[in-house]
């Protein structure tokens, strides 16, 4: 259920981002627009990765393979590190004083969604580590 909510929120953010067209010579605004667009795209890819890992987790529960468990943990570590790095960039951008309300909302939304996704990935990683393998 929460995946559907997050997916709807990402879709809404992407629709809002597409409607907002920056001025032709406003490079800072264009950078903000592209950064949010990339962040939303990365969050969406992270959600798809989480769904894919859920299928791998189901397979791990059936097979109890040590190799598959290690592979899943490595993938989760990489995705979590990428999200944490993106959160740092979003935090730096939120400290800017020249953001308008829409830009601030977009940055805060991307930051909140990335925190939710990171929490879900950490929970999944703990589930994988708790599985006894052969």
From Swiss-Prot:
GO MF term list: protein homodimerization activity
Record's signal peptide: 1-17
Coiled coil found in the keyword field: yes
Native species: Blomia tropicalis
The entry's keywords: Allergen, Coiled coil, Signal
GO biological process assignments: protein homotrimerization
Gene that this polypeptide is encoded by: BLOT5
Family from the record: Belongs to the mite group 5 allergen family.
Keyword Signal: yes
Pfam family, one: Blo-t-5
Assembly and binders: May exist as homodimer and homotrimer.
InterPro entries: Mite_allergen_group-5/21, Mite_allergen_group-5/21_sf
Protein name: Mite allergen Blo t 5
Tissue: Midgut and hindgut contents as well as fecal pellets (at protein level).
Segments forming a coiled coil: 18-113
UniProt superkingdom: Eukaryota
